[in-house]
Design a protein with these regions (language model features):
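Hydrophobic anchor at the beta1->P-loop junction of P-loop NTPases
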Residues: 4-6
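P-loop (Walker A) phosphate-binding loop of NTP-binding proteins
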Residues: 9, 21
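ATP-binding Walker
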Residues: 12
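Walker A/P-loop
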Residues: 15
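Post-Walker A helix-loop "phosphate-sensing" segment adjacent to the P-loop in P-loop NTPases
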Residues: 22-31
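ATP-dependent small-molecule kinase phosphotransfer cores
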Residues: 36-108
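ATP-dependent NMP and nucleoside kinases share a basic, alpha-helical "lid"
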Residues: 97-105, 109-130
Length: 130
């Protein structure tokens, strides 16, 4: 199976490209969508609460993470960002591996990975084309 990576900055057309690819019958793994789902999981919410609740006021209300507050906080603090990524990224990679596994057993010839930070942390290495 050929793995093609979609990457680019905000507003570069990744989402539009992914929609077109999906409309052609191909499967696309959306890293951002996966991260959003992970942030809604109760285990993840509890871990984030332990990590950041004392640092960020009103971070979690009604068992939901205020992702705007979390993002504003961690993107200005590299150490906290690394801590959050160490929680989220392994879960995303697990979902990505399952996506690729499902595609391979269904004999798909091509799979697409929509990964905004493709060139960070060697994410590009698992792609045949970018």
């Amino acid at each position: 199976m050929i793995i093609i990576g979609l990457t680019g900055k905000i507003g570069s057309g990744k989402t539009t490209t992914a929609k077109i690819i999906k409309s052609l019958g191909y499967n696309v793994f959306d890293c951002d969508e996966s991260a959003q789902k992970i942030l809604k999981e109760s285990k993840t919410i509890l871990k984030i609460k332990k990590m950041f609740d004392s640092k960020i006021q009103n971070l979690i209300t009604s068992n939901h993470i205020n992702t705007n507050l979390l993002g504003n906080y961690v993107f200005s603090r590299p150490t906290d960002l690394e801590q959050l990524e160490s929680l989220i990224h392994p879960k995303i990679k697990k979902k990505e591996k399952f996506f690729l596994f499902k595609n391979s057993i269904s004999r798909k010839k091509i799979a697409f990975l929509d990964i905004p930070l493709m060139f960070r942390k060697d994410n590009f290495l698992r792609c045949d084309y970018i």
